[in-house]
């Protein structure tokens, strides 16, 4: 029987335990603050919130921004009237936003081992059942192994080859409508890149250009990316969402990849048996899955690694090229300047070296990265107590202490529009700003430090090649959608209505 005395006794015990826990947490926090002060650190500014306990005001605002397709304006507004470094409460956790290049350098290079992604991506199970271990979910030795599996991305003969791009570009160019006819260039770019990337990753193209229905896998991948972003950002309340649509998309992507995995393992097994029997074998395949399968003989683990390469890679590159064309269609003077540079090359092959030497073309790529970056924010969890160099104190220029468990978000979309870095015309599309400009940590579209994107050179080559091919043929690109850029967030931002244009030879 529960008596009043027993209730009082348990209440007293609970009160004492809660008090001890509170004292412990406060003393731990004070010790950390004392450590920070001893290292010359100063506190960062705090953004006012109507819910300072759980930070649900920011949580709900972010959900609304993502659903309403105004996440980028919301992110810029979040930074407005604040120093370049400030902190918020997000689900009861300290989250630091910063647009200081020196903090990006420290987080991704100088203090690389103090920051990671695994606690917020893998440990939360937010990426499951889509993928578990892979290049974008793990840290430490597991990450080093995932990086090793992507070695073909680093082969110079791969990322410098434009011969592998040419046949797919030829096919896409043949599908572009005649002069003055409106069409969505983004859908063509997506189908072109599906063929190109499936050929590199799986050893054979999907033939999405020839058979548009096969590109339906793109919609499943987009759902996977959208859901993945939501689950990563709101992992503490995944229970509040209905994920049926996401699980369905995950299953569709898995079915597609499983076919290639099983075919590859079967071919490897047959090859090894022929070698064992002393029979001749064909030259080894050079595609990515072949290399990965040789080094990882586990179907589920291989699928996880492949999912975290194939799905994000397909989206980022096709969106980047589409964004280039979206900007150029609205700036005919930039298109003409680019076209004249390409035409000056004559009919000579568009090699890697030739494209790299087209300075204005490279400026266009950079300016597109700047205004519409695929990587809007670069987010890390602090793994060990650390110090970032800029943002503390009243002048927001002193070092500040970052506690283990804190989340740090480098907001590139704000950094890349900072007038102090880019001038008063930072909001304008002006490729000339990169002419002769040496950039460092204030502009790293593919990230910096050990975790920089392994596909950087490949992406730049593919984008440059496609723009150059278009410039050789079309004297004018005309925008057929007067609406401003409305970013739908996937792995990065994509314009809501695609790239509605007309072209003229």
From Swiss-Prot:
> Which SUPFAM superfamilies does the annotation name?
Cytochrome P450
Coiled coil segments of this chain: none
What does the record give as the reaction this protein catalyses? (3E,5S)-3-[(2E,4E,8S,10E,12Z)-1-hydroxy-4,8-dimethyltetradeca-2,4,10,12-tetraen-1-ylidene]-5-[(4-hydroxyphenyl)methyl]pyrrolidine-2,4-dione + reduced [NADPH--hemoprotein reductase] + O2 = 3-[(2E,4E,8S,10E,12Z)-4,8-dimethyltetradeca-2,4,10,12-tetraenoyl]-4-hydroxy-5-(4-hydroxyphenyl)-1,2-dihydropyridin-2-one + oxidized [NADPH--hemoprotein reductase] + 2 H2O
Which InterPro entries does the record match to this protein? Cyt_P450, Cyt_P450_CS, Cyt_P450_E_CYP52_ascomycetes, Cyt_P450_E_CYP52_fungi, Cyt_P450_sf
What pathway does the UniProt record associate with this protein?
Mycotoxin biosynthesis
User: What EC number(s) is this enzyme filed under?
Assistant: 1.-.-.-
Q: Which residues cross the membrane?
A: 6-26
Query: What is the membrane topology here?
Result: Single-pass membrane protein
- Please state which protein family the record places this protein in: Belongs to the cytochrome P450 family.
The identity of this protein, by name, is: Cytochrome P450 monooxygenase iliC
The organism encoding this protein is Neonectria sp. (strain DH2)
Lineage of the source organism? Eukaryota, Fungi, Dikarya, Ascomycota, Pezizomycotina
